[in-house]
Amino acid sequence: MEELLAELLKLRAALLALRPGARLFAFWDLDGTLLRGDCSEGLHEGGRELYPGLVHLAIEDGHSPDYSGDDSGPLRCRNDYRELGERVGAWLAYPFLAQIFSGASEHDLQALAARHFDTTLRKFYFSASRTIFDGLAAVGVEQHILSASAEFFVRGAAASLALPAHRLHGIRVRTVEGKLTRELLYPVTYAEGKVTQLIEIIRAAEAETEQPVFVLAAFGNSFDTDKAFLAHVVRQSLPVGRPLAVMINAGFAPTNYRGLFRSVRQKKVVGDR
């Protein structure tokens, strides 16, 4: 991954030499890409829980009218979530994990997530991913998270990533007077929805400046949820060089995507140091 960082820094330098005022971006998935495991679902390996997911913690804390109130709530939720994914698909299952907290305080759930990231999840960021993430941040590349987890959970990672909260994007539901509802807001940051969110971010940046805006890189870990936005980035035409799209621990690419992405394997996390 250090070689990829060096390549990106070289691309950054070439773009700024050609367009000195350019605004440069990189986009990341969160779960399985920056974070080992899943902030919503937790991390379990070898029959052992390495950390609990935020859905479990929030249900235990009493934030879900559907599942809080008895000890079986987290298990019932997990079973319903898996059944949705198997019978209907991830496009419905991922939003479900945001909608089950209808009536809860968005502020309270984001605070719960921030505590979990700051005390536990920050130790499970992949070391190599953080090397690239921190290296790009150090030279002023504007980085955004595009996650299929609920946005009120994802934004809990802001302090641990040293990012403004508005740069962390997840699945959103409408809020009324600070309380969550079941009504989804679009785009839903799953698959093609991540492309739509990325385009909205770049168009907003272009509207703020007369200088050019370039996307250097995109990082993901799933050909289901991430291939669309990675492909969108790597197929850009830059005035010099070529953007990178990196798949982490993703396995074999579908036929139409072979040779398009860099493939990286990693397991070590910052807490292993």
Where are these regions (language model features)?
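A metal-dependent, Asp-based hydrolase signature
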Residues: 40, 45-135
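C-terminal cap/substrate-recognition subdomain and adjoining C-terminal extension
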Residues: 2-25, 107-273
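Non-catalytic pre-domain segments flanking phosphatase-related domains
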Residues: 1-30, 35-42, 50, 56-57
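Detector for glycine-centered tight turns/loop "hinges" at secondary-structure junctions
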Residues: 32, 62, 178-179
